């Protein structure tokens, strides 16, 4: 997964930025940004499938590949 995939969609960018900021609960991210929860869940599932985040319990954290994207995209 590359930065173009994330930057091409505003919801992907919002979720990515929230994860970078330290928020790791997808339900809180969706509520805070007034997103439909199912859309937020679908996007985070894409991130998991793409290998940039992984689920730890009820929370999501960046993988090594995800950390590289954080450095590339930045904030």
Which residues does each PLM region occupy?
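Short intrinsically disordered terminal tails
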Residues: 1, 74-75
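Short alpha-helical segments that sit at the start of domains
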Residues: 1-15
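Short capping segments at the starts of secondary-structure elements
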Residues: 20-25
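A short acidic, leucine-rich amphipathic alpha-helix
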Residues: 28-32
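Short amphipathic alpha-helical interaction segments
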Residues: 34-48
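Basic, amphipathic "hinge/linker" alpha-helix immediately C-terminal to the N-terminal HTH DNA-binding motif
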Residues: 58-73
């Amino acid at each position: 997964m590359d930065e173009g995939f994330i930057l091409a969609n505003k919801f992907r960018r919002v979720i990515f930025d929230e994860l970078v900021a330290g928020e790791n609960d997808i339900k809180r991210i969706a509520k805070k940004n007034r997103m439909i929860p199912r859309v937020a869940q679908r996007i985070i599932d894409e991130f998991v499938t793409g290998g940039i985040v992984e689920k730890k319990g009820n929370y999501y954290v960046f993988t090594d590949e995800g950390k590289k994207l954080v450095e590339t995209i930045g904030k």
